[in-house]
């Protein structure tokens, strides 16, 4: 699976990317803090889902979706990630809103620090 994350919040990008890799081993992630770069990066690739910051990347998301009509759109927000129902249903591991707390918990578990 190929995912794209687009946000000007680099910490959020890194955290989300690490969580996706943990939950879906073998997935490919393209991180972009620049929406226009993301669009260029995607022009020739099949993408399964685009995780985009709805506040800063609304126009880019629209262009990305026109180029990759089969891609699911997942919007990053202050509370976490809002996933479309179709994506959540087909990927049960991501069927809940991914909050920052859940990301940190998953990363602690990944690093063997679950009890800390």
Q: Which residues fall in each region the model found?
A:
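The C-terminal output helix
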Residues: 108-116
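Conserved acidic carboxylate
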Residues: 6-8
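Alpha4 helix (beta4-alpha4-beta5 surface) of REC/receiver domains from two-component response regulators
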Residues: 77-95, 100
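Acidic, metal-coordinating helix/loop segments flanking the phosphotransfer/catalytic sites
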Residues: 31-49
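Acidic phosphotransfer microenvironment of two-component signaling modules
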Residues: 10, 33-37, 101
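C-terminal output helix
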Residues: 98-109
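Conserved phosphotransfer microenvironments
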Residues: 13, 35, 48-70, 78-84
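Two-component/phosphorelay signaling modules centered on CheY-like receiver
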Residues: 10-30
